[in-house]
Amino acid sequence: MIDKVYCADVKPEMEGKRVKLAGWVYRKREVGKKVFIVLRDSSGIVQVVFSKELNEEAYREAKKLGIESSVIIEGTVKADPRAPTGAEVQADKLQVIQNVDFFPITKDASPEFLLDVRHLHLRSPKVASIMKVKGTLMQAAREWLLQDGWYEVFPPILVTGAVEGGSTLFKLKYFDKTAYLSQSAQLYLEAAIFGLEKVWSLTPSFRAEKSRTRRHLTEFWHLELEAAWMDLWDIMKVEEELVSYMVQRTLELRRSEIETFRKDLTTLKNAVPPFPRISYDEAIDILQSKGVEIEWGEDMGADEERVLTEEFEAPFFVYGYPKHIKAFYMKEDPEDPRKVLAADMLAPEGYGEIIGGSQREDNYDKLIQRILEEGMDPKDYEWYLDLRKYGSVPHSGFGLGLERLVAWVLKLDHVRWATLFPRTPSRLYP
């Protein structure tokens, strides 16, 4: 019995070995009395050659194959430097699982068409590489979090209130009540720290924002951490150590996939602690010196962040934001009541914010005051306020947008390419 091998396992040093391959026809061409097929599977590609002399029946069947036909092939490995992997398989057996007459995706397909047929586009080797990198980033995150003593928890997706502002909630009927899709697991993670101290979760988060920028999705994967006994500076240290490990480990394991998208790895290699830190005040000064029209107290959007990232060749922090542009749960800066103890991590090369974090307000009365200042009803947050009544402690946390991190690592032009089936204001299908 012949062992099945993956396409990427076929190497020149296997010359003369008989192998079985299963996969899909990625490319096909005919030269004389030979049919050359580039076969793909989840591991990569390999060239397979059918010749009339070796097996006329298999050769005739190979001539009929269309792109994306599924096949099982047997043959002998031959070293050939002209082949994509330095070796090819000279096939003498062909089992056609399904022949495809016409595959709708062509080389000149537009981005919008590729999204329309995303269920078919996923089989592209480039898309597969993106998903491998994304999976490896999370594999690395889990490794680091386990080593550092964090507990994974599993918060709800159906919730009763807002975390990041009521105008961006997706509303739905929950029996005889109103529920919403979660914007963030943060409030629930805060509850979990009183038993587990250091917790994290990976969940989908939903934002009903009609933003059509290259870094917004209405559904995205959210890596969130929350820890008791940590202040802002402690949690920033956690952020940089985690992101650095994720990036360096993925560079180690997925370098070839990354180099498919970017040749210059400088900024990734530079993602080593300590990351640069600048205050919001300094950020405004930098932007104004570059001719950006922005005043102290205004939030920085994608355009402002893009200009700011030109100053750095590694991820960096901006801390000390004005209170009125940040969320109600952030702790007021005791040295400047106009500000909160918050910090964002920005990726270089124009990618901007990938993490938002802060020290949380742990005082019951001050938290109620902030809720009222934001025009919200404390009754909607009774259980959350309870956390400040029974053994409240200093604590901090952050959320990382996984697709944004992937987009920076691979230099993608839009976060929609970093998720399996992107959800945007104009796209819910497939």
Curated annotation (Swiss-Prot):
SUPFAM superfamilies: Class II aaRS and biotin synthetases, Nucleic acid-binding proteins. Pfam families: tRNA-synt_2 (PF00152), tRNA_anti-codon (PF01336). It is an enzyme of class 6 (ligase). InterPro entries: Aa-tRNA-synt_II, aa-tRNA-synth_II, aa-tRNA-synth_II/BPL/LPL, Asn-tRNA-ligase, Asp/Asn-tRNA-synth_IIb, NA-bd_OB-fold, NA-bd_OB_tRNA. GO terms for biological process: asparaginyl-tRNA aminoacylation. It is found in: Cytoplasm. One of its GO terms (cellular component) is cytoplasm. Its EC number is 6.1.1.22. It catalyses: tRNA(Asn) + L-asparagine + ATP = L-asparaginyl-tRNA(Asn) + AMP + diphosphate + H(+). It comes from the Archaea. Keywords: Aminoacyl-tRNA synthetase, ATP-binding, Cytoplasm, Ligase, Nucleotide-binding, Protein biosynthesis. CDD domains: AsxRS_core (cd00776), PhAsnRS_like_N (cd04319). GO terms for molecular function: asparagine-tRNA ligase activity; ATP binding; nucleic acid binding. Belongs to the class-II aminoacyl-tRNA synthetase family. This is Asparagine--tRNA ligase.
